[in-house]
Amino acid sequence: MQTGKFPKQVHYFYMRQQSDLKSASEPRARGRILDLFAHKPRERLTPAEILRRAGFARDELQLIVDALRGLCRDGQLVRLKKNHYALPDRQHLVKGRVHAHPDGYGFLIPEDRDMDDLYLNRREMRRVMHGDQVMVRVDRKSRGGAETHIVQVLERGQKRLLGTYDELNGKGFLVPMDARIGAIPLKPGQVKPEKGKVVAAEISRYGTAMSPPEAHVVNVMGDPDDPEVQAQSIVFRYGLSTSFPPEVHREASQVSYAIAPEEVAARTDLRGLPIVTIDGENARDFDDAVYVRKQGDRYELYVSIADVAHYVAAETALDQEAWARATSVYFPDRAIPMLPEALSNGICSLNPKEDRLTKTVCIEFNAKGEVVRSRFINSVIRSHERMTYTNVRRVLVDRDPEVLERYKELIDQFKLMEELALLIYEQRKARGNLDFDLPEAEIIFDLQGVPENIVRAERNIAHRIIEEFMIAANEAVARQLTEKNLPLLYRVHEGPDREALEALAPFLLSLGYRLPLKQERVAPVEIQKLLESARGKPEERVLNRVLLRSMKQAVYQPENIGHFGLASACYTHFTSPIRRYPDLVVHRMFDRALRGDKLKPNEREDLVRYLQEAGKHTSERERHAMDAEREMVALKKAQFMMNKLSEEFTGFITTLANFGFFVELDEYFVEGLVKLSSLIDDDYDYYEKEYIIKGRRHGRKFRLGDNVRVKVVRINAFRSEIDFELVSTGNGKTSKR
């Protein structure tokens, strides 16, 4: 597990109001170096030349070397021969990620989205692996062609590998799970695995043009058919740490559960309010609690969030570990927390009937659900009840007598919450909020932890209440910190590229829908109208899916460009500091706002640089966690389907590709592949622009959303693969197999 990568000067902003930062901080050194190259873009400079020209002190050479290493790692500079450094674009260099093909060649996916992918031949691919971040040089040939040469490996995408053990001529090999990575020789070790066993390995040496890579076994995990081995394999491959370092545990154990009287006296005491938490049945950490009151035609919403920043100070081992993880990871049957349990389930969790320190946002709304004003306070609360979404639904919708009696003192409070939440939602809907309303699967486990059913996850009025209140709080914090001119880590969501929507237009037209593309940018409300027009119709699910795929991913950054999906001009993440590091960053800025801190120019410059790094790091860790979560869900679905071999199910086509199409089963929300090679009645081709697969001789077509009947023919749970065979289509045509 990596630790926080920023020097003390960066976290200093959260520790004191005044700053006496010296110029010898790495973030500022990077800025000075880039400024030098901005004025001398064609130059190739050594560290010594940079020291002299940029005005560094003689004893700052090591600082320059460290800063150059970071700039090269980020692709902002490139190291050339004889220890010279230069700007990449002046050397005709392109930065990107390697995407390998099982046949040995690969492609560079440029960071610049306007560039086409670049082909990497087998010779170049010997030096790299799938996922590596590299810098390449594109050499134009006299006949109009081009050759791509790898100049520098910036970051390795593979450090740990998982696969099965095999032998050839007495020598051990790792056959990686990922088919895009070839077999890798293993160094002889003390432990010799059995053939076919799952082994975890670390790369000892990366490949060169002359020699293959080499790895060594770090753990023999067991049989590939063992469900727990399959689950642990995902945890290993994603480098997720299931334990905390001793120093982190030591700091966590020293946190006092007692709240000092002077701390309570310094805060607003909200313990008299009937504040409650509302979470899922299996939730163990509670970071938000809510309360609503109404005076006349005005509503006042209190959103109280666990004051994690009070317990996790900057520069500590706790903070560094939280930075490194950046997020908690949630699997269907387990979780890997960002903070140790002593904090996440203990003093930071808003457990019922216990005093807790919180940060509270108080928002006043008018009768239409429009925000009138908001204010921030550091507070102390005592949650009156640990409510679940199900029990709130039983109060508001089912009117369950037993539940009504149990929570009779809170019934009016829940009704008021529902009233306000629906008003807020109507305001968001009016400005163009996107609601794709795609069903989510919930995996049900038996007492032995084996998946026994997959059902549609419930979403009720209680979910709507919490969602609306959390969005309102996040917007209020973002607005107020922005108005105070404080740098902030925004949660931003860029709108879809016009090209992506133009490519989608013919398919939408085939369903009878048209998306206005007259303007350069499509407004959220236009996509919202499209979603609304398909509501309740047969094509709703496929239309929602293709539109969602055209969307970009939300990220964290200090530049505010708004949030397209929420149709919000100013948004951040504030409400989940137990499980998200960006929220902890925002909490620290919350404290600066309460103190009325003013930033000096050099403080602002360094803080913005820190927020840029924090945004990049936490966005990457979020994507990493989401990938791991998706893969674990796919594994559990494959495990569930193991006893469904040879059974037939109805479903619909969700994805088309040149090798087949994916079908999601109506009953279980499980997706599997129908390979084109299994369709023996014709030879089929994939027409990407038309969104169809079509037979060459008979013209039979498969489209997104088509209803089909399939048989389960193969399952490889270790690889989370499920293969279907087509039985018939919605028009009654059957496979001739």
Feature-to-residue mapping (PLM):
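Phosphate/ribose-recognition catalytic cores of enzymes acting on nucleotide-derived substrates
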Residues: 7-9
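Charge-lined substrate channels and their catalytic hotspots, especially those that engage the 3′ end
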Residues: 11-302, 309-358, 391-394, 691-693, ...
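A short macromolecule-binding patch
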Residues: 115-121, 181-186, 669-686
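Electropositive polyanion-binding surfaces
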Residues: 200, 205-207, 233-240, 247-681, ...
